[in-house]
């Protein structure tokens, strides 16, 4: 008889535990569960009425006189009685029973020609085999979508069908979740136990821990300086605060005045001290200037004053450049890929919109909103907008752009918007907490042109976008 369970186990291909190499879950079922016509009574045990032949080992055993029963019934009966249950022939152990090879061969020939359904098309069998461990799809609604719909076939053809059956039950070797073979690619992209490369520090982090890694551990993740609000890499924040932060208060130590200023103002304060001191010296020299030597000293002081002034101007320029360069890292570019866009377009009719997932640019939260078939009054036009969730009490200067790229084999041309520059001043009294800030266009392109020219071979629509934070300042309340 066909060893169906061993066949399934041979399909498994285990590899390194750090990769997703799902194994096939051996399917458990009874022949009557898959037969098209249930007329197998001839091969049922007369005692328990269950199947005589299941799995790989022979279950039908007989005594010396030919009385037949399944192995389960023999084991149960011989545990308390050492004789045949029919003819009472003495039997000391189950090893004295024999197989009925003629009946086994007859059953095998009979079964191979029977019409059967795939075990994965039986809801009860499928539900039973999906139980015991977490499963991706285990609700009644999704269960029916996972059942095999191949139709009837000969039992002898079942093994070849099962090798390619999309409803074959697999189990992830990493997270132990069960799923159907057709969902392999989906699980590959969603498994919480897969390691992903952190986009900031390039460390390999569990996908389920990536968000926590960014919030607490990633040394290259941009965090906000609590004093000057500039975004700084986590591993340089201490040095930034100790040596560079322009808003840290420090005490004047050069001229014993004891005054406290922010670091940005302390440099100017020191220059003012130097200028004042030199000016006082200049006044004294002027009063005592009675010879050419005194005139020479005055010229020297003027030269020093001029040098100090040049240093003062250079320092102010360096501070301005330093502030400007602190925003160079606040540039974000990405793509929003919408799968099965034709179905998506049919669902989001005129006036209906769809939002992308939120994304962070520095300390600011944005998302993309599209109108596949137009806003009110713009039916048939593809609208796209950049939405920003408000963060109050700041002046924000940024620019953004959108573009649709046609597939490589298309003759269509790229459609772009931007770069568009925006300057926002957000006070606490201006907006409600839930309101977002929108900018974009409701006539980006024609909705039908999107369907015709911009879908790739998978039916996906790719929207490329880029956002650059150019400047931000805190506005006192």
UniProtKB/Swiss-Prot annotation:
Q: Where are the zinc fingers (TRAF-type)?
A: 160-211, 212-267
Keyword vocabulary terms for this entry = Coiled coil, Cytoplasm, Metal-binding, Repeat, Zinc, Zinc-finger
Q: Which GO terms describe its molecular function?
A: zinc ion binding
Q: Origin, by domain of life?
A: Eukaryota
Ranges in coiled-coil conformation: 271-326
Keyword Metal-binding included in the entry's annotation: yes
Zn fingers (RING-type): where? 45-88
Q: Which Gene3D superfamilies match?
A: Apoptosis, Tumor Necrosis Factor Receptor Associated Protein 2, Chain A, Zinc/RING finger domain, C3HC4 (zinc finger)
Comment text on domains: The MATH/TRAF domain binds to receptor cytoplasmic domains.
Family statement: Belongs to the TNF receptor-associated factor family. A subfamily.
Q: What is this protein called?
A: TNF receptor-associated factor family protein DDB_G0278133
Give the organism, scientific name: Dictyostelium discoideum (Social amoeba)
